[in-house]
Amino acid sequence: MTNETSTADKAETTDETPGGSKRPGRTARHWRAGFLRGGIELRHLLRNPKEMSGHLSNVVVALLIGAYLSDDVPGTHTPMAHLVLAGFAAYLLFQIGLINLPQILVTEREEGALLRLRATPGGIPAYLIAKCLLVVVMATGTLALLLAAAALLVDGPLPRGPGDWLTLLWVTTLGLLAVVPLGAAIGAVLPNPREALALIMLPTMALLFTSGAVFPITSLPVPVQQVASVFPLKWMAQGLRSALLPDSARAAEVAGSWELPMVALVLTAWTVLGFLLAVPLLRRAARRESGSRLTARHRRAARSGAMPA
């Protein structure tokens, strides 16, 4: 990472203040260090045109598709463009948690970030807090941009009342909680960044087309619906549709309703699973790091012409 992030690593090592005054609680130190590191990484992101353009391009693609579609969802008077925009909103959250975050973690592991965390008291918790902050800001910013641009440019959907805004808030929050720890767990076990992208992209693209995000889920074969219902994207998209589409659009859902209790249950289950996997896998990845491993990876990367920056 950058020199600024290295400064945040060093800041995490401070256990007590000069003069022997009482040091703050461990949890408070983790949160303070995590927010410090997260703030540095956010500034780095905002100053990186390449990374910003990647997120903006996803919004542009969604808007172009929304502008192109003119039919209604079969069996309803809801524009297909509205269903697709709601689905893309869910997919952008899903993508940031399960594609962008693992890539960030794998890249930073190749650069030696996990090795530095081994020598940093409370390094893993602070690191996770920083990544959660980064992902939440990226995701909510992208979602807000998509919804605002869609409403202004292609007559896209927006929540119609306080209840729908509340649904949008809790589905977005719970959806991120479901995918961010899972993305961290995946990033802890994946190989180098190029292979990581290949391994993650195909399954996530398959879920995009089978989870009802870009097609009415009732138009898909029943076995496909059943497989998709295991994964969080289907329920994230369904929850966002409930917030953004009129109640008449429920006719295109499998159960004929939004099933919001099931949305909450499935996303909560994935949240618990993700947290149970993420922390031990990241700790294991940090313990396995060594100077010799890092040097060997850099040599292989140099030979292949993919040396980390």
Regions found by a protein language model. Give the residues of each.
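Junction motif at the cytosolic side of a transmembrane helix
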Residues: T2-P18, V254, P261-A309
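Transmembrane helix boundary and interhelical loop/hinge segments in multi-pass membrane proteins
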Residues: G97-G122
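Alpha-helical transmembrane segments and their short interhelical loops
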Residues: I124, I129-I200, M205, V263-A264, ...
